[in-house]
Amino acid sequence: MTSSYKDSSLKVFSLNSNPELANEIATHIGTNLGKCTVSKFSDGEVQINLEESVRGCDVYVVQSTCAPVNQHIMELLIMIDALKRASAKSINIVMPYYGYARQDRKARSREPIAAKLVADLIEKAGANRVITLDLHAPQIQGFFDIPIDHLQGVPILSSYFEQKNLDDVIVVSPDHGGVTRARKMADRLKAPIGIIDKRRPKPNVAEIMNIIGNIEGKTAILIDDIIDTAGTITLAANALIENGAKEVYACCTHPVLSGPAIERIDNSKIKELVITDSIPLPDEKFSTKITALSVAPLIGEAIIRVHEMQSVSILFD
C-alpha cells in the first residue's frame, strides 16, 4: 500500500493467537501494531494492559479463536472491555478463524448452540463490528446484531491453482455441505465439479460412500473450509485415486490440523495441501506437502475499506 495510516485514528492490535498474521496485516495497511501487553496471573487469569492511548480511535483487534480456543476467546473479550473503558471510538474484531463455528445448531436434543453464545459474548463485551473469513456456517452472521464482513478464501486459493496451469481439472467437494464453495472455485477455474457422498458415523470419523461426477483421468482439487483431523479429506483423496483420478490436490481456508492430521496427510494420496494462515502452523505440524498462502492482503484491504467507508464486497464478488 502507498497510503500510510501510522498517524491516523486507525489502530491495529494483536493478541496471542496469530501475531505473525497481525503484523503482516499492519504492514499491508501501512501502520505499526499497537502496543499492548497480554499476560497471566499465577492462577491463569488473563491480564491486558494497553500501552498507548486509543481514545477516539477506530481499533482493529486481530485474534483467531484457534487452539487454545477458550484462552484466545477470553483474551479477546478482556481486550474488548479494555478498549471500551479506554474510550475507543469503535472496536472492530478481526477474527480470521471463528472458533465454535461447528456448533451452529442443535444436531441432537439438549445440545447447546455454542456459535451463538460466542457471538453474544463478543457483542455484549462491546464490539462494534466483526471481520471474519469463511465461516463454517454462513448463517452465523445472523447470530450478531452488529455488522459482519464475511470474507472468502476461494479467490486466494483459486488464484494459486490458476498459476499452476494444471490440466483437465475437476473441483471436488468432500461432502454435500461444501458444494457452494466448490462451485465458486470451479467457476473461477472454468472446471466441472464433483461431490463425494459420505456418511459420518461419529465425530471426526468419515466413511466414503459414493463419488458423483466424472473423475477418470482428471486432476482433482478437493476444497473444504476446515481440515481438522484430516480424516475426511484423506479418505476422499484416496477414493478419488482409486476411482481413476490422475492426481489429487487439496485446499482449505482453516488448517486446524489436530491429532493425527499431519501423519494422515503425509501418508495419503494428496500431492499438495494448500492452506491459508488464518490459523498459524507451528513447526511440529510442518509437512513438505503443505503450502501456506497469506490472507493478510485480503484482510488488510478489508480493514482499509471499512475505515474509509467503502464497499468490501468488491474483494470477493
Curated annotation (Swiss-Prot):
Domain of life assignment: Bacteria
Cofactor dependency: Mg(2+)
Amino acids binding D-ribose 5-phosphate: R200, D224, D228, T229, A230, G231, T232
Principal location class: cytoplasm
Entry-linked InterPro entries: PRib_PP_synth_CS, Pribosyltran_N, PRibTrfase_dom, PRTase-like, Rib-P_diPkinase, Rib-P_diPkinase_bac
GO BP terms in the entry: 5-phosphoribose 1-diphosphate biosynthetic process; purine nucleotide biosynthetic process; ribonucleoside monophosphate biosynthetic process
GO molecular function, one term: magnesium ion binding
Active site positions: K198
Pathway: Metabolic intermediate biosynthesis; 5-phospho-alpha-D-ribose 1-diphosphate biosynthesis; 5-phospho-alpha-D-ribose 1-diphosphate from D-ribose 5-phosphate (route I): step 1/1
SUPFAM superfamilies: PRTase-like
Residues at which Mg(2+) 1 binds: H136
A Gene Ontology term for the protein's cellular component: cytoplasm
Compartments where located: Cytoplasm
Cofactor note: Binds 2 Mg(2+) ions per subunit.
Keyword Glycosyltransferase attached: no
Keyword annotations of the record: ATP-binding, Cytoplasm, Kinase, Magnesium, Metal-binding, Nucleotide biosynthesis, Nucleotide-binding, Transferase
Entries under Gene3D superfamilies matching the protein: 3.40.50.2020
Chain residues that bind ATP: D43, G44, E45, R102, Q103
Reactions the enzyme catalyzes: D-ribose 5-phosphate + ATP = 5-phospho-alpha-D-ribose 1-diphosphate + AMP + H(+)
Function, as annotated: Involved in the biosynthesis of the central metabolite phospho-alpha-D-ribosyl-1-pyrophosphate (PRPP) via the transfer of pyrophosphoryl group from ATP to 1-hydroxyl of ribose-5-phosphate (Rib-5-P).
NCBIfam families to which the protein is assigned, alphabetical: PRK01259.1, PRK02269.1, ribP_PPkin
Family of the protein in this entry: Belongs to the ribose-phosphate pyrophosphokinase family. Class I subfamily.
Subunit relationships: Homohexamer.
Name recorded for this polypeptide: Ribose-phosphate pyrophosphokinase
